[in-house]
A protein has these predicted regions:
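Peripheral, non-catalytic segments flanking oxidoreductase cores
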Residues: 1-173
Length: 173
């Protein structure tokens, strides 16, 4: 894992232990949400929040240096904080659609599984660079990570200038 990050800056992880049934259940609820009518989905769009939680419709996000918005809509799921958390004022609570049964359970379940996997990766990377295994733990334990299921619509015209998602970098790094 350390070599992959040194050479490429990322890696693909197989054998991670997240059950395929859990991944499939999350994909199912995400697909059912994106299939809802636009006016229903827009109930979950939080204007002025930068899409930190809930739904972001088509035409909102534009990649850096692009003239046209990306052809995608997405949903953000983030960490659920204890009520008295000192981070509550900077990390919005999650929003859960009422129209899709199981969305919260499957969506947040996958978020938690991926968050735990991320912690395992950080422990491995810490050891790779000769740090204590738990070096990153107190630096990320309340991090504002997100799970972002994205829906890319079918492209129905050949002359559109947009791309589904323009070239980009992780904005928080």
């Amino acid at each position: 894992i350390g070599a992959a990050y040194r050479e490429f800056g990322f890696c693909c992880i197989s054998g991670h232990g997240i059950p395929k049934a859990d991944i499939d259940a999350a994909y199912d609820v995400f697909q059912r949400f994106f299939a809802l009518p636009a006016e229903t989905k827009m109930q979950y769009h939080q204007v002025g929040t930068g899409g930190a939680r809930g739904y972001t419709p088509f035409g909102i996000e534009t990649a850096k240096d692009s003239k046209y918005p990306d052809l995608k809509e997405f949903w953000h799921i983030g960490r659920e904080l204890p009520p008295a958390s000192k981070y509550a004022e900077v990390m919005a609570p999650n929003i859960w659609p009422r129209e899709v049964e199981g969305f919260r359970q499957s969506g947040y379940g996958l978020y938690q599984a991926l968050d735990s996997l991320g912690a395992r990766v950080l422990r491995a990377l810490a050891l790779h660079i000769d740090l204590a295994e738990n070096f990153f733990e107190d630096k990320v334990n309340f991090g504002n990570s997100i799970l972002r299921p994205i829906h890319y619509p079918p492209i129905t015209a050949v002359d559109i200038p947009n791309v589904r998602a323009g070239a980009h970098e992780d904005i928080n790094f």
